Structure formats: C-alpha cells, structure tokens
C-alpha cells in the first residue's frame, strides 16, 4: 500500500480515536488503556482501504460496550448564549460518504453519550485571572512515557494523536494559529512516520505550531 494511503488512514484513526477518547463513557475510569488500544488498532487500519478502515473502527467502538445517552442535556449546553463561538467543529462525524453509515452512526450517537461520570484523561481545574476563577483543562490522566526517548512507529503517532486532540478539543485559540489546525495532523503523521526523523525535534516543531508566545 502507498504511503499516502497509510497517512490518510492514520488521520482517521487519530480523529475518530480522539472523538471516542473524549466522548465515550467507558473512559470515565481505568477499565481501558486507550493508548494501548490505539497502538494495537493502528496496524489493523494503517494499510486498509476506506471501507475496511471504517468497518474496523466501527467494531472497535462497539468493543467498549453499551452506554446511556443524554441528548437533551448537551443540546441545551450547545444552544446557550455562553457557548464559545469558535468551539470544535464536529460536523465531520456526519460525513457518511467518507466514514460510511455504520461508523458515522456510532460517532453521532457518542456525541450525546451521558458523560456525567467524567473522563479519566482530562479534568477541570481553575486558575485565578483578573480577580476571577477561570476553568482550565488538566491532562493529569495521561501517561508520561519518560522511558521512551526514541519510540517506535506506533508510539510516535500516539504522540501526534494525543497532542493534536488535546488542542482540537481544549485549546480555544487554535483558530488563531498561522497554520490551519486540520492541516497539522496529516503533516505530523507524515513527519513522525519517517524513520529518519528526530522524534524530539518533530515533537517540538509540532508544539511550536500553536504560535502560543
């Protein structure tokens, strides 16, 4: 299979995986290690055609079990006047032409999953600014992997996955970056997939894409 196909398929592995990570109630506790799940999933989808990729991803989501939905709760939040104008665009989950009907249906249903129990990978903390307390995401559930100074292909892409999705869902200024954040993901999948590339150099380069000075 071509490198272009592998990068394209890996992109959907990352965007679908990120959506599942922050929306599926299965990640309210430590029953599942999503990093392990993703690294195991990657070779199954990396060289597959779109239809097979979509089927594998849909079955992967099913593997996390049943859950309750609370559509009214989240619709009320999304229609509130206090909702940030530049919130994450998740319209792509309804793209049946790209994702196929079954995968799209699973992602759309996850949007309304009851997440009352929270998420093990991100919590909300507060910091004081201008005499008021403002919410801030805290990613204290993420594993640091201090011993992986030169990780293999799977964990290199996991780095891209984790950072890109953190920014996608929790960094309100991503729309101000010089480069469209949607373009950053495929670029760094390609960069990290290159065996001759420096892992630390590419990681620093990716972080610098935030232009957060």
Language model segments and positions:
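Flexible, low-complexity junctional segments that flank or bridge functional domains
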Residues: 1-213
């Amino acid at each position: 299979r071509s490198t272009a196909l592998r990068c394209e398929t890996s992109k959907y592995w990352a965007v679908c995986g990120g959506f599942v990570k922050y929306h599926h109630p299965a990640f309210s506790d430590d029953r599942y290690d999503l990093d392990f799940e993703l690294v195991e999933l990657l070779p199954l989808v990396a060289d597959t055609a779109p239809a097979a990729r979509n089927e594998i991803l849909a079955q992967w989501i099913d593997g996390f079990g049943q859950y309750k939905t609370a559509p009214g709760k989240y619709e009320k939040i999304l229609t509130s006047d206090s909702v940030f104008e530049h919130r994450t665009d998740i319209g792509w989950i309804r793209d049946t032409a790209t994702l196929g009907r079954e995968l799209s249906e699973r992602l759309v249903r996850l949007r309304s999953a009851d997440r009352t129990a929270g998420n093990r990978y991100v919590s909300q903390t507060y910091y004081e600014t201008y005499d008021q307390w403002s919410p801030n995401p805290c990613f204290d559930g993420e594993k640091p992997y201090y011993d992986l100074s030169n990780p293999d292909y799977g964990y290199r892409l996991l780095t891209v996955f984790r950072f890109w999705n953190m920014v996608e869902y929790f960094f309100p200024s991503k729309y101000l970056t010089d480069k469209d954040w949607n373009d950053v993901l495929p670029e760094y999948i390609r960069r990290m997939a290159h065996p001759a590339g420096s892992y630390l150099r590419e990681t620093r380069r990716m972080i610098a894409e935030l232009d957060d000075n």
